């Protein structure tokens, strides 16, 4: 085995905490409470609309605040990552919560890496591995692949709410 492959195998990043099941989004406050007090929630428009009420309920008892709910921009592009990172820093958020499909989750992870903040992912579809991996696939704003952004860490938390995923259109 080559030395570079051996080095890669000695460091195996994995999400800090994974919660799954019906109603799992209710644990958002518990997961985020140890990481910060002010959440920046970003995601797809539909994903945010369908989870907003549950997100508020999930953080209510934990005494956390939401700095913003923001659309991720439609593509995991450098432009969207930079714009969202600037907003995160101006809001003084200390935890990123990314909600939606692969591109939304990848954008959230990239924003977290740029801002050096923990990221909790909430996948709303079961089609990708974006919720758990230390990788963001990037595109330009036309949706054309531009590359892979390899991150140092996986999300610190992953919430797989099966009631949300089961309600996803086929």
What are these regions (language model features)?
Residues 51-53, 107-109, 130-132:
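Short glycine-/acidic-enriched loop or helix-start segments at secondary-structure transitions
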Residues 26, 48, 103-105, 126, ...:
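Glycine-rich nucleotide phosphate-binding loop and flanking beta-alpha elements
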Residues 1-94:
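ATP/NTP phosphate-donor binding region
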Residues 40-42, 97-99, 159:
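Structural motif
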Residues 88-111, 115-126:
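A short, small-residue-rich loop immediately preceding and capping a beta-strand
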């Amino acid at each position: 085995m080559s030395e570079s492959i051996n080095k890669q195998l000695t460091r195996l990043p994995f999400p800090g905490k994974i919660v799954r099941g019906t109603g799992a989004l209710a644990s958002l406050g518990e997961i985020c409470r140890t990481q910060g007090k002010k959440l920046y929630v970003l995601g797809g428009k539909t994903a945010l609309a369908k989870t907003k009420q549950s997100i508020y309920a999930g953080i209510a008892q934990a005494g956390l605040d939401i700095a913003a709910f923001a659309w991720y921009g439609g593509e995991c592009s450098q432009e969207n990552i930079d714009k969202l990172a600037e907003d995160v820093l101006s809001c003084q958020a200390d935890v990123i919560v990314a909600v939606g499909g692969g591109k939304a989750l990848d954008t959230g992870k990239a924003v977290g890496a740029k801002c050096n903040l923990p990221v909790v992912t909430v996948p709303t579809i079961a089609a990708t591995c974006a919720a758990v991996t230390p990788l963001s696939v990037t595109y330009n704003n036309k949706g054309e692949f531009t590359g892979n952004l390899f991150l140092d860490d996986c999300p610190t938390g992953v919430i797989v709410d099966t009631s949300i995923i089961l309600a996803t259109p086929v």
